[in-house]
Amino acid sequence: ISCDLIREGKGDVFIAGGSDSFSSLAFSGFHALHALDKNACSPFNHSTGITLGEGSGILVIESYEHAVERGAKIYCEILGSGVSSDAYHITAPRPDGEGQMSAIRRAVESSALSFDDIDYINAHGTGTAKNDEAEFLSLHTLFDGNNHLSVSSTKSMTGHCLGAAGSIEAVFSVKAIKENLVPPTIGYSDEDLKVLSEKAGNIDFIPNKSHTKDVHYAMSNSFAFGGNNASIIFSDNKHDIPDNSKNEKIYITGISKLTGTKTDEHSLNCNLTSEDYDKHGIKVAFCRKLDRFSQLQLLSGMDALADADIKIDKDNEYKTGIVIGTADGPMTEIVDFQKKAITRGTEKGSAFSFPNTVYNAAGGYLSIFS
């Protein structure tokens, strides 16, 4: 977003990043999902779950001309990025990795590069079996012809910092370019190294120890709940990236709203009925998975698509996106989950409701159903 705003002339300098602290809510939720490893995680290895961490990562993003004019130290250039949605499951990735690969392809294409150009990838690498298997498949599918690629998961050292993970790992990627030093995935035993050598193929997974390497192009990948995928590419040089903007006129072709309409004490609440769900073929069993925030988002989204006479299919699914605005998001779900964790204990959180406490769950449900 910062890059887009700079290219549109909306500003010269933007501060971008993320921060997250360790919380009982996150611990309780991931414990309920059986996603925590009792030992330190070692992604793409023997790990059976994540290790939670906390931290913050910030990047100052600036136009080249403005940076040169003020004599700024330049670490690298942001070449391009890509995003996608699995539209598959609220917590698990698509097993075939197609959603992840879509984001990676878009990042490479927007950077005017080829897959063979990438020198280092800071992988999402959480340490859970499903995530690691899907990402391992994605990497080998797309970069099979790249004989100089290094990949690591720095979550093995920092833990999964959740909302801060993407920005922290972006900093690792930038430092890899600046220092010509690629960070490792730690936690490999001698036996683990034997297994890795049999499955790694041409990819250097940097086990246990960092090493020097000329890194001209680095990629950082983040794949989140709801099937939200993002990939970004950094470069050590200034490049002329093709301007793909078409200056097209943009129109509104579909609208919808869900609001309270009564004038009594219920005026602030939307009165949803079975008819609201039935008209879109949404089954009650599916609705029960959703918190109120997600229900409203799903129904209003489906209403707008219907009003625009758009059906999502194989021909347009990769050209259709979702942008959602919210002030409080799933706050009710967050409070309810936290109250239960406090009264019952952090080890007795609900695996059913925890996914609904993340802000991108509503968009994830809409993408899955539509």
What role is predicted for each listed range?
Residues 3, 19-20:
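Acidic/serine-rich, low-complexity amphipathic helices located in mid- to C-terminal regulatory regions
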Residues 9-13:
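Alpha-to-beta junction loops
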